[in-house]
Structures are given as structure tokens and as C-alpha cells.
Amino acid sequence: MADFEIPNFGELLAEHLGAVPPEAYPFLLSQLERTAADRYRGWAQDVPEHAEGLLACAQSEDEIADRVESMFPPSAEHRALVARIIPEAKETYYSAFDSFTPIQQMTIQAGAERQGAGAWQNLKTLYPDRADEFDALSKIELGSADYLNTLLPTLLD
């Protein structure tokens, strides 16, 4: 159990998430998944003895983004809007990790993965015909969280 609070990423990113129309929301989330993939790649460098598993998590984040972009192909307008929003959203996301060690950051990310799984479940109300696909996305998120939760007790701060 972490001796610090895991941020609520929905609240942390609310300003950015609310800056897009509902139909662009999945694309914005997909770009945040790519941001998480970048974090995993960084941790793979920080903890090279576990690079294989961390890079698999990065690949999972990219897979989620690819699936979402396939499910909800963004219009040119939505791509442009998200391109304007994502730098600040990424900065906000990264700021939640700034004062922590890589191991603590991975602890936070495990919580973020579980929150991400919940976010995909919440979208089922807007897109009930995509429920199975959202379940699959949530399963991928939970797989990364489970990996981190298994890895973290083996690491020392």
C-alpha cells in the first residue's frame, strides 16, 4: 500500500477533458494513453532489469490508443483540437509524478490504470453498442495495473 495518495486523474485532467466535445473525448483519451506509454518506456530505462515487462505495458497503452482511434476515427477538426489540448494535458499528467521516485511513480500509474479501466466502463453509457470493446480496453488497462502491482513489491525505493 502506498504511503501517499494516488491522484484522481479524472479530476486532475478535468479541465482538459472538458475542453472537447463528447464525440472527441475518446480520441483525447487515446492520446493520453500514448502519454502513459511514454512513461512506461521511461521506466524501462530507469529499471532495466524489468524493461521487458514495462515495455509490454507501453505496447498495451499504444494498443488501447490504436483500438480507440479505430473505434472512433477522429475528424480533422477533432485531431486539431486535441493537438492543441494534449501538450497541457500531458504536462498536467506528468506533474502528478514529478516529486516521486520511479517506483512511487509506478505505484501511481497502477492506480491510474485502474482509473482508466473505469473510464472505459463509464463510456459504455454513451456508446452501449461498443460495450464489448470497452470491456476489452478495460481488461488491457487492468493487465498493466496487475503487472505493476506484482512488480512493485520486488523493487526497493
Name every feature range the model reports, one short phrase each.
Residues 1-157:
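Non-heme di-metal
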